[in-house]
Structures are given as structure tokens and as C-alpha cells.
Regions:
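A recurrent flexible, glycine/aromatic-enriched loop bordering the glycosyltransferase active site
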Residues: 164, 222-247, 374-412
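Conserved donor NDP-sugar-binding/catalytic core segment of glycosyltransferases
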Residues: 187, 191-222, 345-375
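Short aromatic/hydrophobic "clamp" motif used to bind/position activated sugar donors
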Residues: 179
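A short, conserved alpha-helix in the catalytic core of glycosyltransferases
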Residues: 252, 261-285, 314, 397-407, ...
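A conserved acidic beta->alpha catalytic loop
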Residues: 133-141, 159, 349
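N-proximal low-complexity "stem/linker" segments adjacent to membrane-targeting elements
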Residues: 45-118, 329-344
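Glycine-rich, basic loop-to-helix element that forms the pyrophosphate-binding segment
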Residues: 157-174
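Short, acidic, metal-binding catalytic loop of nucleotide-sugar glycosyltransferases
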Residues: 116-126
């Protein structure tokens, strides 16, 4: 049974008392720091009905313009001239070649062909397609004979090779500056590599990832859009969220390589080991994950193999860094919980604040995590509601968190007292009736902490009830 605490401001200038009655801490967590609670106005919010998702391909004029940009670059123009107005923000001035790697073993040819067509239909032509085929039959090779394109490089690979070994060898053979993989059956949107090219030119990214959705085996119906956050370290430590499309600089890939021992979580292990300073998110759906590819990947694999591999990758991440942490399953697919010993501040010097959720007595979210506009994330949601990808129930980094449910790094306690606690010289404010002032001070304190270079971690299992 989880422990309960409540702290209440009784009058201006007094420090938060430590009476325990209504704060629920994560199981095994350390004692709560000073905090205060105010009575929330528990109004039931009406939710906007969820609209059916429809993937919208870019307009024809947009795709034509992208092709025109590539044609001009191919014709010898400098990228900054071909791109026109957006060239002023370019950090890279050489055109990247992207190596797209597809591994095959006796694939269903119609699925392979769908994937092939989606790659050959790219508006950005600066790529090569590497097919590493371990099939005994000639189906893949015969299909490629109908698509004679100088950018296709076919390799027949003898023997029964693991996916990690195949991709590592293909990466050595690749001529590109960047690499990505596409599973048979999955589809790239027509503008996928163009948007990757733009991101590379503008940011010089080492690793890029995009949003994705799911499609049926025919590639006609789309659902379950996965709109991902920008790089979020603690969300990555809780969930293999980058997934597809993942693009990485070839030199970095060759330095890290995929490891056979993490089959089922190869790219997750790779990203966890990679430097994070040059990771960039392309916030567009550029990859369609097919039900056909998912069925193919699960064939011959234990049902829990992927989760076990992801958990092992996380455990290896902490072991290498000598961080005492226990990784456990949460019961939600692909979501993990990390328990630090003795606590997160002792284990990680990059964390300044640990925040949680503020719930009403009717188990509705009334506070906890704030977005940059100062709005409460998931406000009005039920306590057990996770939303898409269980994001509302997953540990992640936050812009700001609520002072009513907050733990502070010991060496930041003085700053906390200066900003959050009321100095004696100010007029009395009834915090029970002034949630805006509480929100303002919470966000100001968190902003100062982030300016000092610390992360703010939001843990939805750390709860205050008001």
C-alpha cells in the first residue's frame, strides 16, 4: 500500500509542514521534500471527441517542388541556391547520400514490391537502395529485374545470418553519409527522404527520427499515428519511442554497430549507446508500419522476446554507467519503470527536479506537468488513463512541474526556497484560492533549474491528492 502525505500552507511566510496524509509516492521512493497543496477547482472537463485518423499525402504541387529542388541539385546547383529562401539557415552545405537498407529472406513478393515502389518514388533522389538477400529462391532478384534503377545495389548473402550481422555488413558496403533501414512491407511516404535531407542540411544531425503510423497489408488504410516528442532522455529510458524512421550518420553507426545479443531491440540498444547531443526529431509522419511486416517479424520469435531485449538493453545502459537501477515491466507494452538506488538524485547528476501528478479526490488530473504555454498536461483525464502510446502514464522529461508534487535536488533547495516559498515581506496570499500564482512560481523555479543545465523528470506514479 502506497504512503499518503499532505502539506498545507497555513499562513503567509510559514514553511510547508510535513504532516503525512494524502501524498502517494512511487513504491520504494525516498521521503518527500517540502511542498504545499491548494484546493483545486475540480471541474469535470468535457473532452473533444476523438476524430478518425486519416493520413494526408502532401499536395501534388509540394511533391513537384521537392522533385524540382532535387533536379536542380543533381544538375549542379548548390543546395543553397536550389532551396532558395530557406538556404540562409543551412548548417551543412554538401548534399548527403542516404543509404536505405532492406534485408530479405523469402519475402512475400507483393509486400516486397510495395516497399520497393515506396522507396523508388521518393522526391529526393540522393539515395541508394541496398538489398541484402538471404533467400534461397530467386524471387527478390527477379522482381528487381523489372525495376532497373542505378541506385539499387543487390547482394545475395549465403547462409542463415542474423539481422544485426546483415545490416552491419550492408553498412560497410554502403556509400552513403547516412543509413536507415526499412522492413519488407513497410512504406516510406513520398517526401520521407526529402524531409530527412532538409533536417540534415539545417541541423547537421547525427541521428534523426520521424513520426510514424500503421497501415494494413495492402498499404491502403492508415491508423494509430505515433506523434513523438522531441528528444526526451527519460522518455527514451522508459520507452523505445524513436522506432521508425530512424536515420543515423554512417560513421557513427560503424563505430557502434548493431549487437546480435539484443535481437528484437537492435536499434533501441544502438540509440541508448549513441551520443545524444546531435539527435533531431522530424515531426512529420514519414513512415507507414505495415501489419504484414509486424507479422513477419513475430514469426518464429517468442512473444515476449522484444520486451526482454529492450529490458536487457536498458539494463546494459545502466550497468556500463555504473548506475544502480532496477528495470521492471509496467504491464503496458513497451513501457518500463526504472527504480534508482538510493534515489534518482544520488544516481544521476543531470536531474534537478522530480515531479508528479496532482489529482482531485475524484481521481482526475488537476495539476502536475506544465507545457511551455503553462497549461496542465492531461488536465481532466482519469488517473488510470494513458492516452496514445500510454504517454500520460510514462516517465518523461518535462518543461515544468507542479510545486505541490515536487522533489528537489538538495543543492537546489535554497533556490526553491527563494522562488517558491513566500518571503516574509510580501503580503499574505491565500494559496488555496490563488492557483495562478502557484503555477507561475512553479514554472519560474523550473525554468531557473533548466537554465542551470538540469533535467526535470516527471513521474506519473508520484501523486499528490488535493
Amino acid at each position: 500500500m502506497r504512503e499518503h502525505n499532505v502539506s498545507v500552507w497555513s499562513e503567509f511566510g510559514k514553511k510547508i509542514n510535513s504532516a503525512r496524509s494524502k501524498i502517494r509516492l512511487p513504491k520504494g521512493s525516498e521521503d518527500s521534500p517540502k511542498r504545499f497543496a491548494l484546493r483545486a477547482n475540480d471541474k469535470k472537463q468535457e473532452k473533444t471527441p476523438r476524430q478518425k485518423y486519416v493520413y494526408q499525402e502532401p499536395e501534388a504541387s509540394v511533391l513537384l517542388n521537392q522533385r524540382a529542388v532535387w533536379d536542380r541539385i543533381k544538375g549542379g546547383e548548390k543546395p543553397e541556391d536550389a532551396l532558395g529562401a530557406s538556404a540562409s539557415v543551412l548548417k551543412v552545405h554538401h548534399v548527403p547520400l542516404i543509404s536505405v537498407i532492406v534485408t530479405t529472406y523469402e519475402p512475400v513478393i507483393r509486400y516486397f514490391e510495395q516497399t520497393l515502389i515506396s522507396i523508388l518514388s521518393q522526391t529526393y533522389g540522393g539515395y541508394e537502395l541496398i538489398i541484402a538477400d538471404t533467400s534461397l529462391s530467386s524471387g527478390v532478384r527477379d522482381t528487381l529485374d523489372h525495376y532497373r534503377d542505378e541506385r539499387i545495389r543487390y547482394y545475395s548473402v549465403p547462409g542463415n545470418r542474423g539481422e544485426a550481422s546483415l545490416i552491419n555488413d550492408a553498412a560497410h558496403l554502403a556509400a552513403g553519409n547516412y543509413l536507415c533501414t526499412v522492413d519488407v512491407g513497410d512504406l516510406l511516404t513520398k517526401d520521407a527522404l526529402y524531409e530527412v535531407f532538409l533536417c540534415i542540411m539545417r541541423t547537421g544531425a547525427e541521428i534523426l527520427y520521424t513520426d510514424e503510423d500503421h497501415c494494413d497489408a495492402a498499404g491502403k488504410r492508415f491508423d494509430r499515428p505515433n506523434r513523438k516528442p522531441d528528444f526526451n532522455k527519460d522518455y527514451l529510458l522508459s520507452n523505445n519511442y524513436m522506432q521508425r524512421l530512424l536515420v543515423i550518420r554512417r560513421e557513427l553507426f560503424l563505430a557502434l554497430r548493431l549487437r546480435d545479443s539484443f535481437d528484437g531491440a537492435l536499434t533501441y540498444d544502438l540509440v541508448l549507446r549513441a551520443p545524444k547531443s546531435a539527435v533531431r526529431h522530424v515531426p512529420m509522419i514519414l513512415y507507414h508500419r505495415s501489419s504484414a511486416s509486424e507479422e513477419s517479424k513475430m514469426a518464429g520469435r517468442e512473444p515476449d522476446a522484444e520486451a526482454a531485449a529492450e529490458k536487457a538493453a536498458l539494463e546494459d545502459y545502466f550497468r556500463v554507467r555504473s548506475i544502480r537501477a532496477v528495470v521492471s515491466y509496467t504491464g503496458r507494452k513497451g513501457i518500463y519503470r526504472i527504480k534508482y538506488s538510493p534515489n534518482i538524485f544520488a544516481c544521476r547528476s543531470d536531474v534537478g527536479i522530480l515531479g508528479g501528478r496532482v489529482l482531485s479526490r475524484t481521481h482526475k488530473v488537476v495539476g502536475g506537468m506544465f507545457d511551455p504555454q503553462g497549461r496542465v498536461m492531461y488536465e481532466g483525464w482519469d488517473e488510470a488513463e494513458g492516452g496514445p502510446m500510454s504517454r500520460a502514464l510514462t516517465v518523461q522529461n518535462a518543461f515544468a512541474v507542479d510545486a505541490r508534487c515536487m522533489k528537489v535536488r538538495p543543492d537546489l533547495q535554497k533556490l526553491y526556497e527563494e522562488i517558491v516559498e513566500k518571503p516574509e515581506s510580501e503580503p499574505y496570499v491565500d494559496w488555496q484560492k490563488d492557483p495562478q500564482e502557484l503555477r507561475r512560481r512553479s514554472i519560474l523555479f523550473c525554468s531557473r533549474v533548466r537554465e542551470l543545465g538540469y533535467l526535470i523528470v516527471w513521474d506519473p506514479s508520484f501523486i499528490t491528492v488535493v
